[in-house]
Amino acid sequence: MARIAGVNIPSNKRVLISLRYIYGIGPAKAREICQSLEIGEDKRVNQLSEDEIMKIRELIDRDYRVEGDLRREVAMNIKRLVDLGCYRGLRHRKGLPVRGQRTHTNARTRKGKAVAIAGKKKATR
């Protein structure tokens, strides 16, 4: 297993897939990294030389914001919105959807598990 940006990436998978294990690198950035270093996209991590792994490490450290730095930046952006007291900040604070989705029904991922209201009975016919 190669260690890049503090993450153990699987050695039996293709480089293109393995790079996605790093927070902040998705399909497009993984392909961009492979093309800039002229590494075949179908090459597996265990077939890479130590020199190629070092080049990948250096490129990611130099050009991309990943893992802890990116997580910290996202958290700071959310904290800034909350501190401003703007609409998006209020939605974050209340744990509701931020981007205008309906909440009368749905939004269960953001709101959490549904809680039954005590005392409310089903209508009888």
Swiss-Prot record:
Subunit structure: Part of the 30S ribosomal subunit. Forms a loose heterodimer with protein S19. Forms two bridges to the 50S subunit in the 70S ribosome.
InterPro entries named among the record's database cross-references: Rbsml_uS13_C, Ribosomal_uS13, Ribosomal_uS13-like_H2TH, Ribosomal_uS13_bac-type, Ribosomal_uS13_CS
The keyword rRNA-binding belongs to this UniProt entry's keyword annotation: yes
NCBIfam families the record matches: uS13_bact (TIGR03631)
Top-level lineage group: Bacteria
One Gene Ontology MF term: structural constituent of ribosome
Organism: Acidiphilium cryptum (strain JF-5)
Stored PROSITE patterns: RIBOSOMAL_S13_1, RIBOSOMAL_S13_2
Family, similarity comment: Belongs to the universal ribosomal protein uS13 family.
Disulfide bonds: none
GO CC entries: cytosol; small ribosomal subunit
Keywords: Ribonucleoprotein, Ribosomal protein, RNA-binding, rRNA-binding, tRNA-binding
UniProt protein name: Small ribosomal subunit protein uS13
SUPFAM superfamilies, per the entry: S13-like H2TH domain
Record function comment: Located at the top of the head of the 30S subunit, it contacts several helices of the 16S rRNA. In the 70S ribosome it contacts the 23S rRNA (bridge B1a) and protein L5 of the 50S subunit (bridge B1b), connecting the 2 subunits; these bridges are implicated in subunit movement. Contacts the tRNAs in the A and P-sites.
One record GO biological process: translation
